[in-house]
Amino acid sequence: MTHYEGDLRPTTARFAIIASRWNARITDVLVAGARQSLAGNGIGEDAIDVIRVPGAWEIPIAANRVAQSGQHGAIIALGCVIRGDTRHYEHVADLCAEGLMSVQLQTGVPVLNGVLAVERVEDAEARAGGSHGNKGEECALAALELVNLMELLP
């Protein structure tokens, strides 16, 4: 039986971080965490592209373009959707996640979903360097592991 598992070894692949400007106080921390995680694992700044889009709704279309270019080993999607008084939250959060999944399945490029969908600002802060860690860092580590795994798989 063959066992495949990625690891955090540095790779020659490029990484794209696509982040929304909406809720920048949160997303800027997520981006910094992702960049720090990649750098801490041997990925140079010249191998990281940061792409900013207006909001979470626009992340999947940018991810699709980046994935289709074939220039990146993985895409790290970062955003923050906070529940409000309308159903808009559900539309944005759910369809963003669905769009990101579609991109990775259609292109074969791993897309890590670090788009926070939270009830309150405090929940987002807890996941952007607070008591629940930094989801940008976690997505970057998962991206690195998946790039390595994709290189191993037949």
Swiss-Prot record:
Chain residues that bind (2S)-2-hydroxy-3-oxobutyl phosphate: D85, T86, R127
Name the residues that bind 5-amino-6-(D-ribitylamino)uracil. Answer: W22, A56, W57, E58, C80, V81, I82, N113
| EC number(s) on file | 2.5.1.78
Q: Do you know which InterPro entries this protein is assigned to?
A: LS (IPR034964), LS/RS (IPR002180), LS/RS_sf (IPR036467)
Q: Which residues form the active site?
A: H88
> Which keywords does the record carry?
Riboflavin biosynthesis, Transferase
Record field: catalytic activity? (2S)-2-hydroxy-3-oxobutyl phosphate + 5-amino-6-(D-ribitylamino)uracil = 6,7-dimethyl-8-(1-D-ribityl)lumazine + phosphate + 2 H2O + H(+)
**GO molecular function per UniProt:** 6,7-dimethyl-8-ribityllumazine synthase activity
List the pathway annotation.
Cofactor biosynthesis; riboflavin biosynthesis; riboflavin from 2-hydroxy-3-oxobutyl phosphate and 5-amino-6-(D-ribitylamino)uracil: step 1/2
- GO biological process, any: riboflavin biosynthetic process
Q: Name one GO cellular component term.
A: riboflavin synthase complex
Q: Key word Iron present in the record? A: no
**Which EC class is this protein assigned?**
transferase
Under the heading Pfam families, the entry gives: DMRL_synthase
Give a short account of what the protein does. Catalyzes the formation of 6,7-dimethyl-8-ribityllumazine by condensation of 5-amino-6-(D-ribitylamino)uracil with 3,4-dihydroxy-2-butanone 4-phosphate. This is the penultimate step in the biosynthesis of riboflavin.
Q: Which NCBIfam families match?
A: lumazine-synth
> How does this protein assemble?
Forms an icosahedral capsid composed of 60 subunits, arranged as a dodecamer of pentamers.
Question: According to its UniProt record, which protein family does this protein belong to?
Answer: Belongs to the DMRL synthase family.
Classification via PANTHER family: 6,7-DIMETHYL-8-RIBITYLLUMAZINE SYNTHASE, 6,7-DIMETHYL-8-RIBITYLLUMAZINE SYNTHASE DMRL SYNTHASE LUMAZINE SYNTHASE
Designated name of the protein: 6,7-dimethyl-8-ribityllumazine synthase
Species this protein is from: Xanthomonas euvesicatoria pv. vesicatoria (strain 85-10)
